[in-house]
Swiss-Prot record:
Pfam families: WD40. It comes from the Eukaryota. This is Probable catabolite repression protein creC. The keyword Acetylation does not apply. InterPro entries: WD40/YVTN_repeat-like_dom_sf, WD40_repeat_dom_sf, WD40_rpt, WD_repeat_creC_regulators. GO terms for biological process: carbon catabolite repression of transcription. The gene is creC. Keywords: Repeat, Transcription, Transcription regulation, Ubl conjugation pathway, WD repeat. Residues 477-510 are annotated as: Disordered. PROSITE patterns: WD_REPEATS_2, WD_REPEATS_REGION. Interacts with creB.
Length: 591
């Protein structure tokens, strides 16, 4: 009896990718290329200071799936099986020639805080000889035999391009599906990546550059993946190291990752299981066991059993031979993003449970918990002076919070779908007026201007508003007493309302949701649909505004020639990013 052999596996993109053999014949490797276009007269942004003109649209090529990846079938739209974690295109920008951003004074006038882990001698860095080159990862990513990395493609004239370029030019690192690209945005052929890394199955979800260690011969990049693995990558030498390999410390996806300000080695990663983990790029990993018996963990326990922060390993632990350096459990739901304050003391964390948590991460304490109207919060950023926090979320709103007053300032209404990224424009901020932008799944870019004087609280329920103000003052007085108590003893507030909110063992203030009738509303100064797919990332440069989208469009608008405020001298790489995980609900024309 004649039996036919089974058919070969079918992939989404047949024979488009994968070096190998088919029916005895070699299969060529087909690469997809980035495309750049220069639209003329389209999609300009009109603001009070002038017109922002679209310079170019760089479309990153989406890589085909790896041959070992199972074919993507049409799923049941009603299925409740969670989709694999992914992310739209995010950018990490760096200018080698620019000076490092200096810390700004804190809101209480004390100045920049000490560095994370300074009080622990076990974290003291070994002495380094002056003039010695910075340490690089050990493994060559081009010659790697790891199954985690599929291929690495370098430009044929990469060395010449790096030697001939202007050090003040802008490098960009971008993720798109399982590809990670290193781009030179100052080159004439900016669409040609210097290096493209293709991972086997994992998608890089978030990445960051260490501004402290950058030089003409060294750039430290960390990237967190959907598999939970973290890559420390040095592109100049093409060396890399794999941290949290196979999820030995935390096996859930990395949702956000940032270098800790002022540190050469430490970075913080948010995981999808609600944990914040601090890693050291030069330490080995070890199977993690919680240190629940530590004094720090006991300190954060409240008598009501509601602990806003469970310290599974403290930065003050003497056991610092392996990763993690510190590990905190905030919730059982996903941490979507976090941001460090300019004074290097506070940490703003947003979660899928709809909460904004403000931490003093040097003391490992949660100070405030705010709530959205409904749905999760997706993105967060700080004002350049550290006085305000801006968040965006699934309630289609952008919200401004005041750190000194510890309250909501205004709700910003203008998006028609989830807000995926927010960022301040430091070149258009001064002592009184602030400019920030937001993008969302409605394909819109919005610009906002606000000052405290221009915000007016609605007149209804004035008596209740006065009562609420007195409660906030009482809460603020309690926090000030708590901060002044260096011995760690917490005093009970005299206010009965405050006592119901927290107790002597819990310094956290849980703020109730402020009703809409008592919240100021702020309209945008500009609203524009800038593409056909959701926008995932927003960044402000000294000469431009940049966005990136779910399908890989990186758009750049030139600023008007006049009207740039030079009061601030921050690093050119000021950006914000967050995962946008929804399609546009509706689209409207520009306002």
């Amino acid at each position: 009896m004649f039996v036919l052999p089974p058919p070969p596996p079918r992939y989404t993109v047949p024979v488009a990718y994968a070096a190998g053999a088919s029916n005895g014949m070699a299969v060529p490797v087909v690469e997809t290329n980035n495309i750049i276009s220069h639209p003329e007269g389209g999609c300009s942004l009109q603001a009070g200071e002038g017109t922002y003109l679209l310079r170019d649209d760089l479309h990153l090529a989406t890589p085909p799936p790896h041959p070992s990846e199972a074919p993507v079938m049409n799923p049941n739209p009603l299925a409740t099986v969670p989709a694999p974690p992914t992310s739209g295109v995010k950018l990490s920008l760096v200018s080698i020639g620019s000076r490092i951003k200096t810390p700004t004074p804190s809101v209480d006038g004390v100045g920049a805080a000490s560095l994370f882990g300074d009080g622990n001698p076990a974290l003291a860095a070994p002495p380094v000889k002056e003039g010695l080159k910075r340490r690089k990862p050990k493994n060559n990513i081009i010659k790697s035999s790891s199954s985690f990395v599929s291929r690495v493609i370098t430009h044929e004239t990469a060395t010449k391009r790096l030697n001939d370029r202007n050090p003040d030019g802008l490098f960009a690192f971008a993720n798109i599906n399982r590809a990670f690209q290193w781009l030179d945005l100052s080159a004439k052929q900016k669409e040609e990546p210097v290096t493209k890394i293709l991972f086997t199955k994992a998608h890089m979800i978030s990445h960051d550059i260490n501004e402290l260690t950058k030089s003409t011969s060294h750039i430290d990049v960390v990237m967190g993946s959907s598999a939970g693995d973290i890559i420390w990558y040095e592109p100049m030498s093409q060396k890399y190291a794999r941290i949290n390999k196979n999820g030995v410390v935390n096996n859930s996806p990395v949702t956000h990752i940032k270098w800790i300000p002022g540190s050469e080695n430490l970075f913080m990663a948010a995981h999808a299981n609600g944990q914040l983990v601090v890693y050291d790029k030069e330490k080995e990993d070890a199977l993690f066991a919680p240190e629940l018996g530590s004094p720090s963990a006991e300190t954060m326990k409240s008598s009501s059993g509601r602990s806003p922060l469970q310290i599974l390993k403290s930065v003050n632990s003497r056991n610092q031979k392996t990763n993690p350096v510190a590990l905190w459990k905030l919730a059982n739901q996903k941490i979507t993003q976090f941001a460090f304050s300019p004074d290097r003391r506070h940490l703003a964390v947003v979660l899928e449970d709809g909460s904004l948590r403000v931490m003093d991460y040097l003391k490992e304490e949660v100070l405030d918990i705010f709530r959205s109207y409904y749905g999760g919060l997706i993105c967060v950023c700080w004002s350049p002076d550290g006085k305000y926090i801006v968040t965006g979320g699934q309630d289609d709103l952008v919200t401004i919070w005041s750190l000194p007053e510890r309250k909501i300032v205004a709700r910003c209404q203008g998006h028609n779908s989830w807000v995926s990224a927010v960022a301040f424009d430091p070149w258009r901020c001064d002592d009184r007026t602030y400019r920030f932008g937001s993008v969302g799944d409605d394909c819109r870019l919005l610009l906002w201007d606000f000052s405290v004087g221009m915000l007016h609280r609605p007149r209804v329920h004035q008596a209740n508003a006065r009562q609420r103000t007195s409660m906030i003052v009482s809460n603020t007085q309690h926090l000030n007493r708590h901060r002044a108590d260096s011995g760690g003893n917490r005093t009970r507030s005299d206010s009965q309302e405050t006592a119901d909110t927290y107790n002597s063992y819990d310094p956290t203030v849980r703020h109730p949701v402020e009703p809409r009738a008592r919240t100021a509303l702020l309209p945008p100064i500009m609203s524009k649909i800038v593409g056909e797919d959701p926008i995932c990332w927003l960044g402000f440069q000294e000469d431009s505004i940049m966005t990136s989208s779910l399908e890989g469009h990186i758009r750049t608008w030139d600023r008007p020639r006049e009207g740039i405020n030079d009061n601030y001298s921050y690093s050119p790489a000021i950006s914000a990013s967050a995962t946008g995980s929804g399609r546009a609900d509706s689209m409207m024309g520009s306002l």
